[in-house]
Each structure stands twice: as structure tokens, then as C-alpha cells.
């Protein structure tokens, strides 16, 4: 992508409305634009990052055996009345009427709708286990939306729903998602710590939040330091191995970890003093096992091996991609801007032409641009006639991992400069060597 033809509305000044680093940087880098309180447009740079986050989420959901579908944002009030939850959400739920005067709502979550889909088609235990997920916009009318897309009213959510014949089977499905979440956050460049959680209006009696540590986090967290360097389950993990997944779950929940809402002073004090960690954290995922809370009232039953009908045991598993993007920024930035993990960076490499219009510089940049693009890399080519300082500031602000700086003097020697955005290290190398570095 040539920067001269790209839509990248950079802000030179810090927006006054931004309270935290991620909100400030997302606005300055031209990733998002606020349309109204808690509602944002995702501009091209932000959309590229969001798409890469969603791609990783999808890959790990699919690896764990979940199947993607897509449910609508608008739901009928009847389903929520059937489950008994219609009044639980209060003013958070946006309620509307269509032209036929039917009560509708903008879905804050999808337990009722997915249960309705399940009961319409699945009648036998032979079709279980089943895990269905989608990535869709949700709306919750927050009293005080803040922090940009970290706590917005409209947001994108990946929610998965598992269906099993027995509680034991449902716990295995829960453990699958537990492991999938650990892997997802690791691939996003985050260390997420699972913590026992309150189930809230979703319901159930078994729930974990996944929290990343960040100074701007809304939650106070207490945990054992061992979580910071614990090994993440490998890509080769067998998700059908019940004992192995239970082992992973047991390992990750054996040491103390809790938010302030669930904090136990005595349990925390039992940790050796040098191993205690108290910090702020951001919730990036939440999983629930709620048994038959929805299947019982909504008649989601299957015929068991005994020939009798049984309500299915369900779980719900949420990740907010539009919340994850600022969470990644909170965990990875410096005074100059964003430092994206390579897995979600909007571009893999930025080529900075220090003298656009110079024949040698243009030729070297074009060669790098086409060869890296043809090799499958996402390349941003700064071919503008902006000043050098502005080009460097833009590259640092948007956080592209590798910068290739092409100037007349170095090109005359067949060389360019390569900068690592994360470390700040620079080195002068041949054009061919720069190509190899960018290719990884």
C-alpha cells in the first residue's frame, strides 16, 4: 500500500477526550473515529489490526472444534422473556419496536438465540458435543462509556456456545475453550491470567475471567508471580484428550489469582511474600459453564442413550476483539507510539523513502515494495514528500514492526537502514539483506 494513496488521518496533537494511552494512540494514529458516545467507526488502519485479531481468534476456535455461524444483531423480546432474562439487563438493553409494533432488542449477548437455534435442529445425543460461535456486533447502553473502544456501547464480540449431554462432557468443552483462550492471547502478544469470576447476569456456577496486567486496568488483581512465565499449551495440543486438558486447567488454576471482587486475603497472604503480585488488570475474555440455566426453560433437550429426553448442559465463551486492540496497545507502547506484536501489526514492514523523486531512491523502494509484497508481506510504502522527521514520527506512531529507511547516501552504496520498532535498534545493511530481514 502506497501511503500517498492510503487513508491515514494522523492527528498531530493529543486528543483532549482521551483518558488512557490506548485511546489517545488509536485516535492519533487514525485507527478509529468516535461517532457518538461509546460508538466508533474503525478506519482503515484500525480495521487491518481488527481483522488480524479476528483471524487469530477464528483459528484457535476452529482448532478447538468450534464451528462458526452468524446470528443477527436484532433479536425478538419473546426469546428473552422465555428465558426469564428480559428484565435482568435493565436500561443496558436497547429495546425497540418494528413497524408491526413487535418488541425487539439490539442483542447484548446471544444465549437465548443460540439455544433457540439448537433446539430447532438437534434432537439426539449423537449430535453432541457441539460448539457454535460467531463474531458479531453487540450493544449495551453503558451509563458511562469511556476509554475509547475499551469500554464502548457498541462492540464486536466473539461468543461461542457449547452443548453437551452431561456435566462431565460440558466441563471438557469448558476446558477446550480455556486452553483455546490461553493460546489465543499468547498469539496476540498478551499474557492473560485466568481468574475465578462472578457469573453476573449470564448465570451459572463455574466461570473464569482472563486478565492482562496493565497500569490503566479497571480491575485490581492479586495473583502468584508464576503466571508470568508459565508455558502455554502447544499448537499440537489434542483437544479430544480429556485428561490432558483437565491437567492444563488444573495447572493454570492451582495458584491463587483473583480480581478484587473475588479476592480472599487469607489465600493471598498464604503466598510467599516474594511471589505475590498486586497490580491493575484488563479483562480480555470471560468463559462460563451454566448447566441447564437456559436449556431447561427453553426446552433445549436431546434424547439420551436411555431413550429419555435430557436438557443439555451449556457453556458460553466471550472475547471482545474491539476491546483486545486497545488492550494490546496498553501492554505494548512507548512515548513515540504503538509497538504492535508482529501477529497483529497493520503492516509487516514500512519502507520510508527519504527523498521521493530521486531516481535511485525510488528504484530501490520500488524493488523492495514489489518483492516483499509478492512474497506475501503486508507492506506500507511511504512515498510521500513529507519531511524526514514527519515520516519517522508516523512510522513510530502506527507501530509497524520493521522500518526500512532508504536515503540517497546509503543507496549510492547499495545499502539501506533497517530499524526494529520494538528495540529501536538500527543497522545499515545491503538491500538484499534488508529484504531477508523483512521476510523473517
Curated annotation (Swiss-Prot):
Superkingdom per UniProt: Bacteria
GO biological process: one example: prolyl-tRNA aminoacylation
GO MF, any single term: proline-tRNA ligase activity
Coiled-coil features, chain-numbered ranges: none
GO cellular component: cytosol
Keyword Mitochondrion attributed: no
SUPFAM superfamilies in alphabetical order: Class II aaRS ABD-related (SSF52954), Class II aaRS and biotin synthetases (SSF55681)
Membrane-spanning parts: none
Family to which the UniProt record says this protein belongs: Belongs to the class-II aminoacyl-tRNA synthetase family. ProS type 2 subfamily.
NCBIfam families: PRK12325.1, proS_fam_II
PANTHER family: MITOCHONDRIAL RIBOSOME PROTEIN L39/PROLYL-TRNA LIGASE FAMILY MEMBER, PROLINE--TRNA LIGASE
UniProt-recorded name of the protein: Proline--tRNA ligase
Name of the gene: proS
Amino acid at each position: 500500500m502506497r501511503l500517498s494513496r492510503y487513508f491515514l488521518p494522523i492527528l498531530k496533537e493529543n486528543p483532549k477526550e482521551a483518558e488512557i494511552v490506548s485511546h489517545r494512540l488509536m485516535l492519533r494514529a487514525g485507527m478509529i473515529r468516535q461517532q457518538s458516545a461509546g460508538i466508533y467507526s474503525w478506519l482503515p488502519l484500525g480495521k487491518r489490526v481488527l481483522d488480524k485479531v479476528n483471524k487469530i481468534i477464528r483459528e484457535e476456535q476452529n482448532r478447538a472444534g468450534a464451528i462458526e455461524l452468524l446470528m443477527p444483531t436484532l433479536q425478538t423480546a419473546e426469546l428473552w422473556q422465555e428465558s426469564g432474562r428480559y428484565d435482568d439487563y435493565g436500561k443496558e438493553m436497547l429495546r425497540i419496536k418494528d413497524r408491526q409494533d413487535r418488541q425487539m432488542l439490539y442483542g447484548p449477548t446471544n444465549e437465548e438465540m443460540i439455544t433457540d437455534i439448537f433446539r430447532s435442529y438437534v434432537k439426539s445425543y449423537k449430535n453432541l458435543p457441539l460448539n457454535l460461535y460467531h463474531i458479531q456486533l453487540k450493544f449495551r447502553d453503558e451509563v458511562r462509556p469511556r476509554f475509547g473502544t475499551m469500554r464502548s456501547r457498541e462492540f464486536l464480540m466473539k461468543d461461542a456456545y457449547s452443548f453437551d449431554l452431561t456435566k462431565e462432557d460440558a466441563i471438557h468443552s469448558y476446558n477446550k475453550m480455556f486452553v483455546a483462550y490461553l493460546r489465543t492471547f499468547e498469539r496476540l502478544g498478551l499474557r492473560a491470567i485466568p481468574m475465578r469470576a462472578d457469573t453476573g447476569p449470564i448465570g451459572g456456577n463455574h466461570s473464569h475471567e482472563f486478565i492482562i496486567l496493565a497500569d490503566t486496568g479497571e480491575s485490581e488483581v492479586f495473583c502468584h508471580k508464576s503466571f508470568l512465565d508459565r508455558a502455554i499449551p502447544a499448537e499440537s495440543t489434542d483437544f479430544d484428550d480429556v485428561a490432558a486438558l483437565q491437567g492444563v486447567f488444573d495447572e493454570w488454576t492451582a495458584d491463587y489469582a483473583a480480581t478484587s471482587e473475588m479476592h480472599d486475603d487469607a489465600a493471598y497472604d498464604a503466598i510467599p511474600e516474594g511471589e505475590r503480585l498486586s497490580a491493575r488488570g484488563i479483562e480480555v475474555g470471560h468463559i462460563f459453564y451454566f448447566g441447564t440455566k437456559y436449556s431447561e426453560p427453553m426446552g433445549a433437550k436431546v434424547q439420551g442413550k436411555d431413550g429419555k429426553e435430557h436438557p443439555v448442559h451449556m457453556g458460553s465463551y466471550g472475547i471482545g476483539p474491539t476491546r483486545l486492540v486497545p488492550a494490546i496497545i496498553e501492554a505494548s507502547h512507548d512515548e513515540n507510539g504503538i509497538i504492535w506484536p508482529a501477529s497483529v501489526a497493520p503492516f509487516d514492514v514500512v519502507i520510508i523513502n527519504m527523498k521521493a523523486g530521486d531516481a535511485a531512491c525510488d528504484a530501490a523502494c520500488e524493488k523492495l515494495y514489489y518483492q516483499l509484497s509478492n512474497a506475501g508481506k503486508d507492506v506500507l510504502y511511504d512515498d510521500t514528500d513529507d519531511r524526514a522527521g514527519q515520516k519517522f514520527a508516523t512510522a513510530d506512531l502506527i507501530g509497524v514492526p520493521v522500518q526500512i529507511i532508504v536515503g540517497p547516501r546509503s543507496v549510492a552504496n547499495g545499502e539501506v537502514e533497517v530499524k526494529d520498532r520494538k528495540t529501536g535498534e538500527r543497522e545499515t545493511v545491503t538491500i538484499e539483506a534488508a529484504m531477508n530481514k523483512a521476510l523473517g
